UniProtKB/Swiss-Prot annotation:
SUPFAM superfamilies: Osmotin, thaumatin-like protein
Source taxonomy: Eukaryota, Viridiplantae, Streptophyta, Embryophyta, Tracheophyta
Gene behind the chain: RASTL-4
Signal sequence extent: 1-21
Paired cysteines (S-S): none
GO biological process: defense response to fungus; killing of cells of another organism
Annotated keywords: Antimicrobial, Fungicide, Pathogenesis-related protein, Plant defense, Signal
Alphabetized Gene3D superfamilies for the sequence: Thaumatin (2.60.110.10)
Family: Belongs to the thaumatin family.
Role noted for this protein: Associated with resistance against stem rust fungi.
Protein name: Thaumatin-like pathogenesis-related protein 4
Keyword Lipid biosynthesis belongs to the record: no
Record Pfam families: Thaumatin
Amino acid sequence: MATSSTVLFLLLAVFAASASAATFTITNNCGYTVWPAAIPVGGGQQLDQGQTWTLNVPAGTNSGRIWGRTGCSFNGGSGSCQTGDCAGALSCTLSGQPATLAEFSIGGEHDYYDISVIDVYNLAMDFSCSTGDALQCRDSSCPDAYHQPDDPKTHSCNTNSNYQITFCP
């Protein structure tokens, strides 16, 4: 007969397996440097043309956002960007100036994701889920994106999916 600690361990193992992190692979295909930002995890960094940034986002992350900043100049972690700036910081902790947004919530029965240009369009972006639809936003009229808060543009993926964001696809 199993002990209570064995049963507890097995339950925790099952729960942990069902609520694992999602991997976000962010690629810059633009002919110029992009400084992606990510909240609430990730912060931000410089991505030269052809470079990739991989983020592990824990289950239970709600209202996550990733966006591309352009025309940036940083020195020692502070500076400014022409688009998508977040208070002059290289590593963002809050959203900043309006930009094309990849939005997501991870965990629960399903993951949810979308592209938003409600505030502004600043950069072409594809956002895809390993078990769902590939969203494309190539210009300000992109049909896959939210343009108004009540647009029905949220998509769902199976929990434990991984994601790909490509700037200038």
